[in-house]
UniProtKB/Swiss-Prot annotation:
Protein name from the UniProt record: Trans-aconitate 2-methyltransferase
Keyword annotations: Cytoplasm, Methyltransferase, S-adenosyl-L-methionine, Transferase
Biological function: Catalyzes the S-adenosylmethionine monomethyl esterification of trans-aconitate.
Family: Belongs to the methyltransferase superfamily. Tam family.
Top EC class, one word: transferase
Amino acid sequence: MQDWDPDLYRQFEAERTRPATDLLAHITITSPQFISDLGCGPGNSTELLHRRFPDAQLVGIDHSQAMLASAQQRLPHCTFVEADIHQWHPSQPQNLIYANASLQWLTDHPHLFPSLLSQLAPKGVLAVQMPDNLDQPSHRAMREVAENGPWQQTLQEAGATRAKVLSANHYYDLLAPHAERVDIWRTTYYHPMPSAQAIVDWLRATGLRPYLAPLTEAMQLAFLQNYLAIIDKAYPARTDGRRLLAFPRLFIVAHAQR
């Protein structure tokens, strides 16, 4: 798959950063020494962490060279490392492992989440936010378009790139035996978007990537045209002309045992 596009991702940075801010607001630890930002992207979440904990040894982790370059330019005094989160092991126990909108792209959560929790220092915190929108019209439309077109064979596995987020009960059972406390909540954000095209542009940077990457440029344009037609009907204009994009997200904050 082609590398991520930081410029496209940042088109809706305020909307993408709001859940990161909400997640950070639920972290109550003070003066952490070691922090890792897993899936740091272009550094918007890392910047929040740096402002909150300016004295911490903060490292941003991502597998995208383009995103890391953008993050380093944004925060030249912070450390960024290219790594696969599945293979990531810090050199010392972490006081805070923060993952905003990244772990939904990884598989094997029953192994991954306890593994991350085990890499915390005593009283450390694992803080996670994941989009939980695969059943939303925006993502159902992706699968519908993929199954109906000349790209059907090419895109057979596109939907498997991202697994469905597990239930809150499942994550609680994975973490609670190894944690002092586990807080889980779900929030649905309603983003007023100026047009159906704006919704498509938002998703081109993230959810649509596995569907567009295998296609030729001509097929990408045709796919997006078909997708836009469905989105236009799925998100009708409100009284002010805007389209309301519902975006549910799952939050998890697990506190390590003392």
